[in-house]
Design a protein with these regions (language model features):
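Short structural boundary motif marking the start of a folded domain
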Residues: 1-4
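Short polar catalytic/cofactor-binding loops
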Residues: 7-11, 35-37
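Short glycine/threonine/proline-enriched tight-turn/helix- or strand-capping micro-motif at secondary-structure
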Residues: 11-19
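Conserved Rossmann-like nucleotide-binding pocket used by diverse enzymes
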Residues: 13, 38, 64
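Residue-level marker for the onset of beta-strands and adjacent loop->beta junctions
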Residues: 13, 51, 127-129
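Glycine-rich beta-strand-centered segment in the early N-terminal region that forms part
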Residues: 18-35, 48-96, 101, 123-125, ...
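Cytochrome P450 core scaffold surrounding the K-helix E-X-X-R motif
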Residues: 40-46
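NAD(P)H dinucleotide-binding glycine-rich loop of Rossmann-like/cofactor-binding domains
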Residues: 91-159
């Protein structure tokens, strides 16, 4: 698949990388149709973070579910979903309190987890053709069919 890869400060390129894949039964794969470039991405682009070279950028994503893990119950292939940038598990103490930005499962020992963001876990970003979404029943916000025509508007919900 093609993805936007961080190579160091002021150096990003679209490269061919291995396809994202389902790793756990609660994962889904989303074909990304829209992704935002956020002002926060500039921190990494300009080298003001410890973002590792070779990582895929992109923490504000939206797209169509193309594959589901065996443990996914709510999300279905073909669903159009918005993916909030915070990656949560949905069942830890913090997630149950609504503090998903401080999930204790997805990036233990630090503040929260996010797709393709410095110091917020090893989750790859969505500036790629495919994105692995963990704990999909919790992290995928289902959108109505008419959302396809307004995907740029709905993508803003991922921030």
């Amino acid at each position: 698949m093609k993805a936007v890869i961080y190579n160091g400060p002021y150096d990003v390129k679209v490269k061919d990388v291995p396809d994202a894949k389902i790793v756990r039964p609660t994962d889904v794969l989303v074909r990304i149709t829209t992704t935002n470039i956020c002002g926060s991405d500039l921190h990494m682009y300009e080298g003001r973070t410890s973002f590792e070279q070779g990582r895929i950028l992109g923490h504000e994503n939206l797209g169509e579910v193309v594959e589901i893990g065996s443990g996914v119950e709510r999300v279905k292939v073909g669903d159009y979903v918005c993916l909030p940038f915070n990656v949560g598990c949905g069942f830890c103490e913090n997630c149950e309190k609504g503090l998903t930005g401080f999930c204790l499962t997805t990036n233990p020992g630090t503040v929260g987890a996010a797709y393709g963001f410095a110091e917020m876990g090893s989750w790859e970003g969505g500036q790629a053709e495919l994105l692995r979404v963990p704990f999909a029943d919790f992290n995928c916000l289902g959108l109505p069919p008419e959302a396809v025509a307004k995907e740029d508007d709905y993508a803003r919900l991922s921030d």
